[in-house]
From Swiss-Prot:
Its cofactor is Zn(2+). The lineage of its organism: Bacteria, Pseudomonadati, Pseudomonadota, Gammaproteobacteria, Vibrionales. Binds 1 zinc ion. It comes from the Bacteria. NCBIfam families: PRK04860.1 (NF003421). Residues 18-161 form the SprT-like domain. It is found in: Cytoplasm. This is Protein SprT. The keyword Zinc applies.
Length: 168
């Protein structure tokens, strides 16, 4: 277990088992229990690794949003694994996934979270064009510095230029 307290891990395991039990009853078959990991960084709350039958959760966002993770994020990621096991490769938030979210877990098929991400958000850098300013992530900023990418304003079509200002 990485960066997570035992009690929180226990609650996550309980939620995971409850989801698989619901799916087993609903589909009248036995699904393998997914592996739970806390090795996810950035702004994503969770991610399902389909071939590995693994769910990775963002430990920082989990600590800050315990109830939502247990009631929404874990079922969301389990639904991805179930969709893959039942239907193979289909659209990530397509009709099959939505039917599992709504039919099995009785949850809305939301595709994104609304968590505050200030604690996990990386550094941003200010870029500008003729008409406005843009915050670029550190990943995009580094690509510009290494001459691997350039970014263009969709409005004025000018290449964005670094202002020299780090925003966060």
């Amino acid at each position: 277990m990485k960066k997570i307290e035992f009690e929180l891990h226990y609650q996550a395991q309980k939620a995971l088992h409850a989801c698989i039990d619901k799916a087993n009853r609903y589909f009248q078959r036995q699904f393998p229990m997914p592996l739970l990991s806390y090795q996810l960084r950035g702004k994503a709350a969770g991610k399902a690794y389909l071939q590995l039958n693994q769910i990775r959760l963002n430990p920082i966002l989990f600590k800050e949003n315990k109830t939502a993770f247990l009631e929404e994020v874990i079922p969301h990621e389990v639904a991805h694994l179930l969709t893959y096991q039942l239907y193979g490769r289909v659209k990530p938030h397509g009709a099959e996934w939505q039917s599992i979210m709504q039919g099995v877990f009785l949850l809305p098929a939301n595709t994104t979270h609304q968590f505050a991400v200030a604690s996990v958000q990386g550094k941003t850098f200010q870029y500008r064009c003729q008409c406005r300013e843009f915050p670029l992530t550190i990943r995009r900023h580094n690509k510009v510095l290494r001459n691997e990418a350039s970014y263009t304003c969709q409005k004025c079509r000018q290449t964005l230029i670094f202002t020299g200002i780090q925003l966060s």
